[in-house]
Amino acid sequence: MWKEAAAEALPEVEFRAPVDATALAEAERRLGRGLPAQLTALLMETNGMVGEYGTDVVWSLDRIVEQNLLFWSPGTFPGLYMPFDPLLFFGDNGGGDQFAFVLTPERPDIFVWDHEDDSRLWAARELEDYLHRSLAGSGDWYR
């Protein structure tokens, strides 16, 4: 389902080998929280997606874990940004802005974090909507 949705928006989208349940369980253990169901389903089909110009529209599971652990660490950006704890980052636009699920309160919407002004803006209704918008759009499609 996820590969088909992505290829519909951008036939040249690149896929990776899927992750297995063991890798997902280990990732959730390291993160200390569960992954959103839509993201889990996508990762079980493909371990990330690469769009035009090598943009990591959906990161690999390893990158999701590493980036979120970094952003959730209290010493990473002390006093520079609002807390990232409610967010789970999973992709970017290739220019520094990152896309995330909101974990607290849990909702299916995708938000974008602007690294220049620390704003967090709504970008898509859910993951499939995000894939269509990000893969078919150009530039800063979410603005």
Task: Annotate each predicted stretch with a short phrase.
Residues D118-Y142:
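Compact, glycine/acidic-enriched structural inserts
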Residues M1-Q98, W141-R143:
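A surface-exposed partner-binding patch
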Residues G91-G95, T104-P105, H115-D117:
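Short, flexible beta-strand-to-coil junctions
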Residues D85, R107-P108:
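Sequence-level motif detector for i,i+2 pairs with an aromatic at +2
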Residues P108-D109, R120:
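Long, low-complexity acidic/proline-rich regions
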Residues T104-R107, L127-D129:
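A short, sequence-level motif marking secondary-structure junctions
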Residues A100-L103, W122-A124:
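Short conserved micro-motifs at the rims of enzyme active sites and ligand-binding pockets
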